[in-house]
Regions:
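Short, hinge-like loop/turn segments at secondary-structure boundaries
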Residues: 87-90, 177-180, 223-226
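Juxtamembrane amphipathic/hinge helix adjacent to a transmembrane helix
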Residues: 29, 208-240
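Residue-level signature of catalytic and energy-coupling elements of molecular machines
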Residues: 7, 91, 116, 159, ...
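C-terminal signal-anchor/stop-transfer transmembrane helix together with its immediate cytosolic
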Residues: 1-22, 227-267
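Soluble extramembrane regions of membrane proteins in the secretory/endomembrane system
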Residues: 83, 94, 111, 115-119, ...
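Membrane-embedded segments
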Residues: 13-128, 143
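Solvent-exposed loop/turn segments at secondary-structure junctions
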Residues: 38-39, 76-80, 102, 136-139, ...
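VWA/integrin I-like adhesion module and closely mimicked acidic/polar interface patches used
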Residues: 104, 129, 136-200
């Protein structure tokens, strides 16, 4: 009868709740600093530089669920679109709202980088990273890009820089009385400065000339930035039938032994 009772318990699949499990995973703090000047509407990347950059960055965010990630945008000015967070649903929703024209036009690379540094400098993470993406030359702001890089270095922040735009000229849309027209504009990216920012902070400079190369760049950064951290994961349900199964096996074994020894001689 005891074996039958235990079998009933097993079939009921008992579970425990409120359990914690320790695991090891990768996690760092990352701030994305993205140029949203009007030149990011150029269509050498599809559908344009900004949307291509948003798509690839969003995929990068989805691939790093345990990271604190924030978003800083810049043109002639800079502001924080989203502070560091592990709530990537909120981050991605705020990312969708990023468009040229929400701040004064221009390219303040130094200001954008300095803002990103201010958002990550107090982080206690083992690895602090900024991914700065721009398609132009610093022409606004009171902080020089190299000065901002020195500040980043002081706080132990590594900066990866990405220059986005094809070689030569790129088609740029503009509105006329006859609708949208396109004009080929020169692609001017201050690569020496972007390389210097990366070198100063221990990062790396990349050039993205199309969608595929931009995607590959983020993939490369993803591979380079892996830091093991300890994470406690909360599990609501945990199967507990194994101990009961062991008990059932033990009872059956005892019953078999009794049947072949003591109970064998009972008429």
């Amino acid at each position: 009868m005891a074996a039958v009772a235990v079998l009933i318990v097993i079939l009921a699949r008992p579970q425990s709740t409120n359990s914690w499990q320790n695991s090891s995973t990768e996690g760092i703090d990352i701030v994305l600093a993205m140029d949203i000047s009007t030149s990011m509407m150029a269509q050498d990347l599809k559908p344009n530089r900004l949307e291509a950059s948003k798509d690839v960055a969003s995929a990068f965010i989805n691939g790093r669920p345990n990271d604190n990630i924030g978003l800083v945008v810049f043109a002639a000015e800079s502001f924080t679109q989203c502070p560091l967070t592990t709530d990537h649903t909120v981050l991605l929703n705020l990312f969708k709202d990023v468009q040229p024209g929400i701040i004064q036009d221009g390219t303040a690379i130094g200001l954008g980088l300095a803002n990103a540094v201010s958002r990550i400098k107090d982080s206690q993470a083992k690895s602090k990273v900024i991914i700065l993406l721009t398609d132009g030359v610093n022409n606004q702001g009171e902080i020089a890009p190299v000065t901002a890089a020195e500040i980043a270095k002081t706080f132990g922040v590594r900066v990866y820089t990405i220059g986005v735009g094809t070689q030569g000229k790129a088609p740029y849309p503009f509105q006329t009385a006859f609708g949208v027209q396109y004009m080929d504009v020169d692609v001017e990216i201050d690569e020496p400065t972007l390389k210097q920012i990366a070198a100063t902070t221990g990062g790396q400079y990349f050039r993205a000339t199309d969608n595929a190369s931009l995607k590959e760049i983020y993939s490369e950064i993803d591979k380079m930035e892996k830091t093991k951290i300890s994470v406690q994961e909360y599990s609501k349900k945990q199967e507990e039938y194994k101990n009961w199964a062991i008990l059932l096996f033990s009872l059956l074994l005892v019953e078999i032994l009794l049947r072949n020894t003591l109970l064998r001689n009972i008429p």
